[in-house]
Amino acid sequence: MADVTSDYECAVIDEIQMLGCKTRGFSFTRALLGIAADELHLCGDAAAVPLIQELLKVTGDDVQVRSYERLLPLVPLEVPLGSFSNIRTGDCIVSFSRKGIYKLKKKIETGGKHLCSVVYGSLPPETRTRQARMFNDASSEFDVLVAGDAIGMGLNLNISRIIFSTMKKFDGLERRDLTLPEVKQIAGRAGRYGSKYPMGEVTCLDAEDLPLLHSSLKSASPTLQQAGIFPSFDFIYMYSRLQQKRGLYQILEDFLENAKLSENYFFANCEEMLKVAAVIDELPLSLQDKYLFCISPVDMDDEISSQGLTQFAENYAKKGLVRLKEIFSPGSLQVPKTHSALKELESIHKVLELYVWLSFRLDELFPDHELASSQKVICSMLIEEFLERLGFQNPTSRKLNSLMAKKRRQYL
């Protein structure tokens, strides 16, 4: 979350069109309205400009709009990839499920010509960065990238061609066609200025998906109508005074149902927050502490992650002090040998990340910040080694074997 308590001479918010996102939009709106900067630069899709101008009328800010053209051309191809034998160095093939990503990686590497880096949302940020660096390195043999939609955010990549393995994704509610902004954001990662390629290309794995790709790239993005917001604790607290003897879950549910918003705003999806509230409502915690746990970075659909949050909250309620060693044994982490073990390690990383997040806000009560941080790093390194080993299922070069040995020594 952006720091809205300090003063800055200049600040930059990238991908500002994300303020219209149903799940993450509130964090961009919060940054836009809350960052105390003499000058604030907003980068992103022009579709967000009218809404931003409308929002900032209220604050009295001076808004200047400067438009820039893409420096390198993006060329939608007329033919699909068709076969994995047509994969080439610099390609990025996109899937929208973790299972799909590893399936594609295996198919490409089975051909024996390429090794694949992978980038997807549930990988630790450190691992995503290292996978991207390995793909960008011309001396690396990992010359193809397989990625989820996380590719569109926060990574600089030397991609020559984007290949959509599908033009549909499951959004948590239904399997639907990709939206126009989603297509543009992902396709636009090919041939970025500063990469070694003179242009970017984009196509699909299957011919049946090409019409949606081409129509999306030709169309202007729809103008954003609303920005996401999220109820702050102050609002929840004031509302709670009218809801005597009710738990946070009921207070939140009633607040979201009855609150009246300006036409320029919508409440971001609070489903995750409500799931946490339902779990911790019975604990003897103050409303403010419950709210803190509710806004913490936890995936309640991940069993290990949700158990971690529950244990942290229970220990905090009973003892007022949460030691990491009570639920986690340092030194027990190992390189995963299966995909299920990899997923478990990703979940453990989420728990460690949650502890670090809580330690920043309740530092004396979550005192093992350094231990959690160091174990988090080890977690991401072990995941990294597993991903590299996946690329060694075929006979490998001495250089790759040497690379693995060097990394293992760093873990010890």
Predicted features by range, described:
Residues C10, Q17-P73:
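Post-DEXD/H (motif II) to motif III coupling segment of the RecA-like Helicase ATP-binding lobe
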Residues E39-V49, S139-S140, L157-K218:
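Conserved segment of the helicase C-terminal RecA-like domain
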Residues M1-T5, A138-N156:
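Conserved two-lobed SF2 helicase motor
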Residues D14-I16, S165-T166:
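Walker B catalytic acidic pair
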Residues K103, S117-G148:
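Conserved helicase ATPase core of P-loop NTP-dependent helicases/translocases
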Residues T23-S27, G34, Y68-T110, F135:
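Conserved interdomain hinge at the start of the Helicase C-terminal
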Residues P231-L412:
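Non-catalytic terminal extensions of ATP-dependent helicases
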Residues H41-C43, A48-P50, F84-G112, C116-Y120, ...:
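Conserved strand-helix element at the start of the C-terminal RecA-like helicase core
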